[in-house]
């Protein structure tokens, strides 16, 4: 399922992922992916996983397991992407020297998403499929952000199918909390400390705001004004319907 070839394409260092040409956004002379991550051009020798071989098998799997990906909007997104045609996936790097060496070729480093995804089962004592942990917890349910849905709902099931292992029971994809319209992330420096919110507004108010403001699967924009106003409304009108 894996072979050696050469790769060239646009790569997001922040998301650790290559980006298709039709998903590139140009702004001020630079290229970005749909999530706002700047892209750089990469050319290197690479090992590839034959992802294209699993396209039809994945589509059959989605069809026979209609609740595998929720919410439905994310399922439709994944199916549309797979139907558009899967290319073989680069699964090694030579442009840096940190990470796990490819066992048969030490100048190559295993692609981070290949070794990261296997943690779901290696933490359960795999390859010992008879371990209590593996038998109890696999297959499991993954709760992931919408920005990494393809890794979990396309690449990961294909890896598992190739290894003749069960895919996850379900992929649950949540949206983002944004801060003034931007994704909240350490790299952007706009992270909100939940402990500070609790200290300022109280635990129940914070919980209420988070659950009330964003239907599951959608994005929600954080605002201290909104959480304060919501708290005041239900303190002053305790019988008001939620």
Each PLM stretch: what is its role?
Residues 27-28, 191, 209, 229-231:
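Short, intrinsically disordered/low-complexity patches at protein termini
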Residues 1, 9, 75, 145, ...:
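Conserved short loop/turn motifs at secondary-structure junctions
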Residues 47-224:
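Alpha-helical recognition segments enriched in aromatics with Gly/Pro capping
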Residues 233-242:
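Single conserved hydrophobic/aromatic residue that forms the stacking wall/gate
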Residues 19-23, 88, 223-224, 232:
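Alpha-helix boundary/capping detector
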Residues 9-16, 175-177, 225-229:
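A glycine-rich phosphate-binding loop feature that marks nucleotide/adenosyl-phosphate handling sites
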Residues 1-61, 66-67:
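N-terminal, positively charged nucleic-acid-binding surface of large information/translation enzymes
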């Amino acid at each position: 399922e894996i072979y050696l070839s050469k790769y060239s394409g646009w790569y997001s260092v922040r998301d650790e992922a290559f980006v298709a040409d039709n998903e590139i956004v140009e702004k001020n002379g630079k290229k970005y992916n749909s999530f706002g991550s700047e892209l750089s051009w990469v050319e290197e020798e690479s090992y590839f996983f034959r992802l294209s071989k699993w396209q039809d098998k994945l589509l059959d799997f989605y069809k026979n397991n209609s609740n595998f990906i929720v919410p439905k909007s994310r399922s439709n997104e994944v199916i549309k992407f797979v139907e558009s045609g899967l290319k073989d996936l680069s699964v090694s790097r030579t442009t840096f020297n940190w990470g796990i060496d490819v066992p048969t070729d030490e100048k190559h480093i295993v692609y981070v998403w290949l070794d990261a995804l296997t943690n779901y089962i290696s933490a359960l004592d795999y390859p010992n499929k008879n371990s209590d942990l593996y038998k109890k917890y696999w297959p499991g349910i993954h709760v992931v952000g919408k920005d990494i849905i393809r890794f979990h709902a396309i690449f990961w099931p294909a890896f598992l199918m190739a290894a003749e292992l069960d895919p996850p029971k379900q992929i649950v994809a949540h949206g983002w909390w944004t801060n003034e319209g931007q994704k909240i992330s350490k790299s952007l420096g706009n992270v909100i400390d939940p402990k500070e919110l609790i200290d300022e507004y109280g635990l129940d108010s914070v919980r209420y705001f988070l659950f009330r403001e964003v239907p599951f699967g959608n994005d929600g924009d954080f605002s201290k004004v909104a959480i304060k106003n919501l708290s005041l409304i239900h303190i002053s009108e305790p019988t008001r319907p939620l």
